[in-house]
Amino acid sequence: MSSYRLPKRGLVDRNVPLSFTFDGRPMQGLEGDTLASALLANGRMLVGRSFKYHRPRGILTAGAAEPNALVTVGRGGRAEPNTRATMQELYEGLEARSQNRWPSLAFDIGALNGLLSPFLGAGFYYKTFMWPAPLWEKLYEPVIRRAAGLGKASYEADPDAYEKSWAHCDLLVIGAGPTGLAAALTAGRAGARVILVDEGSLPGGSLLSDTATIDGKAAADFARDTSDELRSMPNVQVLVRTTAFGWYDGNVFGAVERVQKHVREPASHLPVERLWRIVAGKALLATGAEERPLVFGGNDRPGVMMAGAMRAYLNRYGVAPGRTPAIFTTNDTGYTLAQELEAAGVDVVAIVDSRPAAGVDYRGKARLVREAVVCGTKGGKAISAIEVHHGGRTETIAVDALAMAGGFDPIIHLACHRGGKPVWSAEKAAFLAPGSLKGLEVAGGAAATTGLAACLGEGAARAEAIVRELGLPCPPVAVVKVESEEGIRSPAPLWSIPGIKDKAFVDFQNDVHLKDIGLAVREGYSHVELAKRYTTSGMATDQGKLSNVNAIGLIAKARGVSPAEVGTTTFRPFYTPVSFGALTGAHTGHHFQPVRKSPLHDWAKKHGAVFVETGLWYRSSWFPRSGERTWRESVEREVLNVRKNAGLCDVSMLGKIEITGSDAAEFLNRVYCNAFLKLPVGKARYGLMLREDGFIYDDGTTSRLEENRFFMTTTTAYAAGVMNHLEFCAQVLWPQLDVRLASITDQWAQMAIAGPKARMILQKIVDEDISDAAFPFLAAKEVSLFGGALHGCLFRISFSGELAYELAVPAGYGESIADALLEAGKDHGIMPYGVETLSVLRIEKGHVTHNEINGTIVPADLGFGKMVSAGKPDFVGKAMLQREGLTAPDRPQLVGVVPLDPQQSFRSGSHILAKGAAATLENDEGYVTSSAYSPHVGSTIALALVRNGRNRHGEEVLVWSGLHGESTPARLCNPVFFDPQNERLHV
Amino acid sequence: MASLVPCPNCGRRPKEEFTIKGAALSRPEADADSIDWFDYVYLRENPRGAYEEYWHHTSGCRRWLVVARDTVTHEIAACCDAAGRARSEARK
């Protein structure tokens, strides 16, 4: 079947055959092929089914704009749907599958949609599936989604690696065609730092499929020699297989490099794709031009191809597009193709030229039909004939391929990514890049310059000017001599063609045809943005690279205005689809986010801790012992043991901030709502930090270790936020204060030693006297351990309500000190306990956490109203705390809740309803913020924020959870369930 | 996607290193009118064009900066240390 491969011609290596499969069928291609060229060489015309009508589709282009030849490449986690066969380099063993067909590509049931097409026009689903509404989600959408679509994503994990990189340069050249190569060479020789990117596998762009000679060399050889010279320069980086997909502020360009998408088994030491962010002093857009399709009946039939694509398959890949091709052209480039086909031994059946006369003197064998158009095609899964409309009649000519040459549209996407709108040029009959772009220039085909010599010259001249702007000396630019047979590109666009009967496609990928555009205009959707959304023209993976200008031209014609008046839709990144893998980079799996482990993590693990993830931290949750069947049993044992003997808990993850400076006390006085200025040295104090809106931000204890040195603790979750906030206060609000802040969370291992026997255990390792007299409640100071072997900080603070201390030691000593404390307390019954027990202990004591400090709570709501300093002239939140809404009597207030029946339970998040009240939003009295089973009380206990709760102790309420269908009669009470007189703290 | 912030301490750095607080407003005096406080805490301009914001170089020098940027083009016109500006305003 490989009979379409020509014996000579092209850049493919006929000595290196490559085996691949398409829909399971084995085929052969050559080194240097794309999947598309290999399929064509195998005579494969039909490669896909269209989006809506499931029409047979072939290969339309030879590049990035391909709307039809989308296939799934690879298998398992490497399966990549919607791969453009025109961009996929062939490799040995490549597996490709066609998409959007069932049961097979050749026999596709979905093609029945074609019969329904009168009902499937633009906006059909807006009109058709309106009623009954519930069917939309259940029936219409699933059915439509199955019928209309592209490839399917793999559900398996991607086994490959991706990475991100930054690059910096003086000049970024986008596109390594004639313009880009000439520019890069000029700037590179002048010594500028140049990055040249091209989406193709080889630098050269159109040179690779051009038969011209440059300085006596074949165009492709010129491209190779030029890129070789560029690669030899230390100041030049050439990135192939790299698509610049976006232009962003700061002249930063996004680009994706497909490092290993052209190999069967990616090497594990390299990424498969690399996302570049390129910071460019200047950039030159040398992306060339896209050939414009012609809109005639059946222009989507396999075998119809862009003329430039046919040139590429012929000259670069050595593949004949057919044996009896015809050419439909509106300009002279069609004749160049005809001559090249004939030179390759392929006889052109006919050249259909829309103009009365050509600009070139064609002397080939093809029949010339002037002032004529192709208005239709015939054939099943491949073209068999064209219908030529000329002189008022229609003639059928048998062909097996058709090239269409409809003129050229500059590829200006990137130039429009920062808000600039394309400008219609009547002279060039094309949309050009917006003028006066900062940092980006457009040259060559992208600026509607035509002709090889002109592009080479323009690329060099623009680079020279940029180099001079950079202040570098620029050696004289060598003028190259070009011999080319390419005809001049005629600007006259051909929007509409007479005599069309079959569907004439405007947007191939979305199955939008001529009549859809007309319908949109008739129904009032003639604004280009509305027409796009109503017809879907210009959407999906190709983003209308081929269709947009034709759609605009047709709308303009229907409205009787110039395309300038219609304008374009908005160009946004990405130019072509970028994989999620590339955007994610290395942030997958366990690299998705960092893991934070306390310095006591290994100690906890050694003692059998069960860990829980809280934010980035792994915290020891409880420490099961043999014989315990549930976590509740372990937690109850730990709770009772703390109340009876002593427990040791890792609290290292609390945020710790050291605050120093001669104004440190004044600073704390301003960031906390309670007073800190006169906190004595050697004392700790509980502090409440507000936001400027008056609500509580965070809480914690802060100790004055020296006159001008404080040790602050924050909650675990808000540690980073508090640090940022304090820095804001110190730098922006009060820069005149002498204060220094340092995050010391990671420097200290901190452990709570709580329980009636805490002191006698701790005293065994602490050198100083820590009796109640010498070291009373809220004492805080640096202590010496083991006879001066180590120093730490000791705080007599208690979250559990017991006699308790927190000991901070340098992080690296954490594990040995924790072990030493367990050893010291062995005879006193010490046990490790985790955050579950910590939580039960604090709920029993009515201590709050961020469950209660939920961002809508002020100090008075928690019973801390008297803590707020009335005397301080200023603190964060002072002004707004006075608002009437924040002092209203019906504010939510902290209360305790217990079930009437101790056997019953309820959970956090449940709502509080007055007894007998219906469960409505208006009757909502508040909600349960924290709950736990309390071994001390012998039932579930909870904290809740309840409207006017402080005055409702003793009231019977209903705890209701609609989510779980639970309602539990309960009683509001004092939130302190254990030792309300705080006697145990002061022993 | 990839704007660069010219940090006065660290040079041009990617925006991912920064966190943005919002409008660079001056805090009212403690005894200012409640209207001023409402403005400061809740009300924001939403200009199309030039805008000054507090940015924190969280993963860099940890300084708070005043970034003057254009909300349309994202171009940054100026970037200075917020403390320096606050001090010079206090002198006025």
Curated annotation (Swiss-Prot), chain A:
<dbReference type="InterPro" id="IPR023753">
    <property type="entry name" value="FAD/NAD-binding_dom"/>
</dbReference>
<feature type="binding site">
    <location>
        <position position="206"/>
    </location>
    <ligand>
        <name>NAD(+)</name>
    </ligand>
</feature>
<feature type="binding site">
    <location>
        <position position="806"/>
    </location>
    <ligand>
        <name>(6R)-5,10-methylene-5,6,7,8-tetrahydrofolate</name>
    </ligand>
</feature>
<dbReference type="GO" id="GO:0008115">
    <property type="term" value="F:sarcosine oxidase activity"/>
</dbReference>
<feature type="binding site">
    <location>
        <position position="714"/>
    </location>
    <ligand>
        <name>(6R)-5,10-methylene-5,6,7,8-tetrahydrofolate</name>
    </ligand>
</feature>
<dbReference type="Pfam" id="PF01571">
    <property type="entry name" value="GCV_T"/>
</dbReference>
<dbReference type="Pfam" id="PF08669">
    <property type="entry name" value="GCV_T_C"/>
</dbReference>
<dbReference type="InterPro" id="IPR028896">
    <property type="entry name" value="GcvT/YgfZ/DmdA"/>
</dbReference>
<comment type="similarity">
    <text>Belongs to the GcvT family.</text>
</comment>
<dbReference type="InterPro" id="IPR042204">
    <property type="entry name" value="2Fe-2S-bd_N"/>
</dbReference>
<dbReference type="InterPro" id="IPR013977">
    <property type="entry name" value="GCST_C"/>
</dbReference>
<dbReference type="Pfam" id="PF17806">
    <property type="entry name" value="SO_alpha_A3"/>
</dbReference>
<keyword id="KW-0963">Cytoplasm</keyword>
<keyword id="KW-0547">Nucleotide-binding</keyword>
<feature type="binding site">
    <location>
        <position position="198"/>
    </location>
    <ligand>
        <name>NAD(+)</name>
    </ligand>
</feature>
<keyword id="KW-0520">NAD</keyword>
<dbReference type="InterPro" id="IPR027266">
    <property type="entry name" value="TrmE/GcvT_dom1"/>
</dbReference>
<dbReference type="GO" id="GO:0005737">
    <property type="term" value="C:cytoplasm"/>
</dbReference>
<dbReference type="InterPro" id="IPR041117">
    <property type="entry name" value="SoxA_A3"/>
</dbReference>
<keyword id="KW-0560">Oxidoreductase</keyword>
<dbReference type="GO" id="GO:0000166">
    <property type="term" value="F:nucleotide binding"/>
</dbReference>
<dbReference type="Pfam" id="PF13510">
    <property type="entry name" value="Fer2_4"/>
</dbReference>
UniProtKB/Swiss-Prot annotation, chain B:
<dbReference type="InterPro" id="IPR006279">
    <property type="entry name" value="SoxD"/>
</dbReference>
<comment type="function">
    <text>In the presence of tetrahydrofolate, catalyzes the oxidative demethylation of sarcosine to yield glycine, 5,10-methylenetetrahydrofolate and hydrogen peroxide. In the absence of tetrahydrofolate, catalyzes the oxidative demethylation of sarcosine to yield glycine, formaldehyde and hydrogen peroxide.</text>
</comment>
<feature type="binding site">
    <location>
        <position position="57"/>
    </location>
    <ligand>
        <name>Zn(2+)</name>
    </ligand>
</feature>
<dbReference type="Pfam" id="PF04267">
    <property type="entry name" value="SoxD"/>
</dbReference>
<dbReference type="GO" id="GO:0046653">
    <property type="term" value="P:tetrahydrofolate metabolic process"/>
</dbReference>
<dbReference type="GO" id="GO:0005737">
    <property type="term" value="C:cytoplasm"/>
</dbReference>
<feature type="binding site">
    <location>
        <position position="10"/>
    </location>
    <ligand>
        <name>Zn(2+)</name>
    </ligand>
</feature>
<feature type="binding site">
    <location>
        <position position="7"/>
    </location>
    <ligand>
        <name>Zn(2+)</name>
    </ligand>
</feature>
<protein>
    <recommendedName>
        <fullName>Sarcosine oxidase subunit delta</fullName>
        <ecNumber>1.5.3.24</ecNumber>
    </recommendedName>
</protein>
<keyword id="KW-0479">Metal-binding</keyword>
<comment type="similarity">
    <text>Belongs to the SoxD family.</text>
</comment>
<dbReference type="InterPro" id="IPR038561">
    <property type="entry name" value="SoxD_sf"/>
</dbReference>
<comment type="subunit">
    <text>Heterotetramer composed of subunits alpha (SoxA), beta (SoxB), gamma (SoxG) and delta (SoxD).</text>
</comment>
<feature type="binding site">
    <location>
        <position position="61"/>
    </location>
    <ligand>
        <name>Zn(2+)</name>
    </ligand>
</feature>
<dbReference type="GO" id="GO:0008115">
    <property type="term" value="F:sarcosine oxidase activity"/>
</dbReference>
<keyword id="KW-0862">Zinc</keyword>
<keyword id="KW-0560">Oxidoreductase</keyword>
<keyword id="KW-0963">Cytoplasm</keyword>
<dbReference type="GO" id="GO:0046872">
    <property type="term" value="F:metal ion binding"/>
</dbReference>
